[in-house]
């Protein structure tokens, strides 16, 4: 994003000069910053990233099929004893790798989206209600927990997390305790 902004700013100072560039300068970078921020948010959103990859995947598949057809036609001509007048044909394996790389990216996006969704469901399941806020005393929140119940729920979640952490530490110590003995015997 910084590179995009740095590339866009020098033409403004050259075109605008002294006072005119100063009046136009602050408005344009803010718009570019907002555009850059939106692009960053889209990059982090797996669903948006997936949607952006679909046209690339279609193009890659079309290119792959075109190269496969060209290679097949060239091989057929060679098998029939005819010389190919087309010249060098693109490599099928490179376009296949490009296609698979895009498929892998899309798979990762879908897995990430699924993970985000399952975390959202788990969050709603384990903390389904909100605590009433002091900033909105007039608003009646029927599904909210009293603060004391919320505190007890959070304390139980922290206790559970500590138990899991301690169990993982014990397992790690057991594994580390066994590892030097096996290495020393080799």
From Swiss-Prot:
Keyword Electron transport part of the UniProt annotation: no
Disulfide bonds: none
Compartments, as annotated in UniProt: Nucleus
InterPro entries: Mediator_Med29_met
Principal location listed in the UniProt entry: nucleus
MF term (GO), any: transcription coregulator activity
Stretches the record annotates as Disordered: 1-41
Function: Component of the Mediator complex, a coactivator involved in the regulated transcription of nearly all RNA polymerase II-dependent genes. Mediator functions as a bridge to convey information from gene-specific regulatory proteins to the basal RNA polymerase II transcription machinery. Mediator is recruited to promoters by direct interactions with regulatory proteins and serves as a scaffold for the assembly of a functional preinitiation complex with RNA polymerase II and the general transcription factors.
Record-stated family: Belongs to the Mediator complex subunit 29 family.
Protein name: Mediator of RNA polymerase II transcription subunit 29
UniProt organism field: Xenopus laevis
Organism placement in taxonomy: Eukaryota, Metazoa, Chordata, Craniata, Vertebrata
Gene from which this protein is expressed: med29
């Amino acid at each position: 994003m910084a590179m995009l902004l740095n590339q866009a700013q020098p033409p403004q100072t050259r075109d605008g000069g002294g006072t005119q560039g100063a009046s136009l300068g602050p408005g344009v970078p803010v718009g570019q910053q907002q555009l850059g921020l939106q692009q960053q948010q889209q990059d982090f959103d797996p669903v948006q990233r997936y949607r952006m990859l679909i046209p690339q995947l279609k193009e890659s598949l079309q290119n792959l099929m075109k190269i496969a057809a060209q290679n097949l036609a060239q091989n057929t001509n060679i098998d029939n004893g005819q010389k190919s007048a087309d010249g060098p044909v693109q490599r099928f394996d490179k376009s296949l790798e490009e296609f698979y790389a895009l498929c892998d990216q899309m798979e990762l996006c879908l897995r990430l989206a699924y993970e985000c969704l399952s975390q959202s469901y788990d969050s709603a399941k384990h903390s389904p209600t909100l605590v009433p806020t002091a900033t909105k005393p007039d608003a009646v929140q029927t599904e909210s927990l009293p603060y004391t119940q919320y505190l007890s729920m959070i304390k139980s979640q922290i206790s559970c997390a500590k138990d899991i952490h301690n169990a993982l530490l014990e397992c790690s110590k057991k594994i580390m305790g066994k590892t030097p003995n096996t290495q020393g015997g080799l």
